[in-house]
């Protein structure tokens, strides 16, 4: 029984570390945000964030939302360099495809809405 418990814990650890090393494909880096620095798009993104994202990622994007407290791994802190240093295309790919507890939005948000959300996520940069 101890053996199965140890194997289970190891597998959980591997899954958690796989979530932490989330890398978009190289091709995503080159995708350009057509709404970059568009204030109206950013405002629309803010409204979507309040509807879809804040419960896990928090009102200030620090990964401390009420629904995210019990998640493993924790939701991303959007103000950190590990997020902000990625290209818009990489963030768009991750938002579109999801992973683990992060659901894919490519079926529920159109491309314009996803770019608008990326614009708003950029406002969390320290």
List the predicted regions and their residue ranges.
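Gly/Gly-Pro-rich "capping" loops immediately C-terminal to redox-active cysteine motifs
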Residues: 35-36, 42, 62-90
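Sequence/structural segment immediately N-terminal to covalent heme-attachment motifs in c-type
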Residues: 39-62, 96-97
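Glycine-centered loop/turn positions within well-structured domains
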Residues: 51, 76, 100
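Hydrophobic h-region of N-terminal signal peptides that target proteins for export
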Residues: 9-17
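Stable alpha-helical elements in mature extracytoplasmic
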Residues: 41, 48, 87, 91, ...
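Sec-dependent signal peptide recognition
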Residues: 1-9
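C-terminal capping alpha-helices of c-type cytochrome domains
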Residues: 19-20, 93-96, 100, 106-126
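Electrostatic cytochrome c docking/interface patches
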Residues: 20-48
């Amino acid at each position: 029984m101890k053996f199965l418990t140890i194997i289970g814990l190891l597998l959980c650890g591997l899954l958690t570390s796989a979530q932490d090393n989330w890398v978009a494909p190289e091709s995503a880096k080159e995708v350009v945000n057509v709404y970059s620095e568009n204030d109206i798009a950013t405002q629309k993104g803010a409204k979507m964030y309040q509807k879809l994202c804040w419960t896990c990622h928090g009102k200030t994007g620090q990964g401390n939302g009420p629904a995210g407290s019990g998640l493993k791994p924790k939701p991303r802190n959007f103000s950190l360099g590990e997020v902000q240093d990625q290209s818009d295309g990489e963030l768009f790919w991750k938002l579109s495809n999801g992973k683990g507890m992060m659901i894919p939005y490519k079926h529920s948000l159109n491309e314009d809405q996803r770019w608008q959300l990326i614009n708003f996520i950029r406002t969390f940069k320290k």
